[in-house]
Amino acid sequence: MRLLIIILAFVLMLFQYDLWFGKNGYLDYQETQQEIAVHKEENTKLSQRNQVIAAEIKDLKDGVNAIQERARLQYEMVKPNETFYRITKEHK
């Protein structure tokens, strides 16, 4: 009877080891959950960036204001009869 209890305890320990440390065990599950959380956060950031880019593309296709703004800021272009003033900081 004592031998049977020892064998059953050993088998139980093997199952517990596999449950906690084996493939698809608890530790593996926790690691996977952390990776999923990181990927969800990345996906959220990328989705927000995509929405901004899509809005900018729509504005460039449909509106003249976005094109004018880009021309003014990036290429320092002005309309006819318009004065361009550049304000710079003084270096001390």
Swiss-Prot record:
Bilayer topology: Single-pass type II membrane protein
A single Pfam family it belongs to is DivIC
Subcellular localization is given as: Cell inner membrane
Q: One Gene Ontology cellular component annotation? A: cell septum
List keywords of the entry alphabetically.
Answer: Cell cycle, Cell division, Cell inner membrane, Cell membrane, Coiled coil, Membrane, Transmembrane, Transmembrane helix
Q: Which GO terms describe its biological process?
A: FtsZ-dependent cytokinesis
Give the record's family classification: Belongs to the FtsB family.
Kindly give the InterPro entries that the UniProt entry links to this protein. Cell_div_FtsB, FtsL/DivIC
Q: Which residues form a coiled coil?
A: 27-62
Q: Name the domain of life.
A: Bacteria
Tell me the protein's name. Cell division protein FtsB
Summary of the function given for this chain in its UniProt record: Essential cell division protein. May link together the upstream cell division proteins, which are predominantly cytoplasmic, with the downstream cell division proteins, which are predominantly periplasmic.
Q: NCBIfam families this protein is in?
A: PRK00888.1
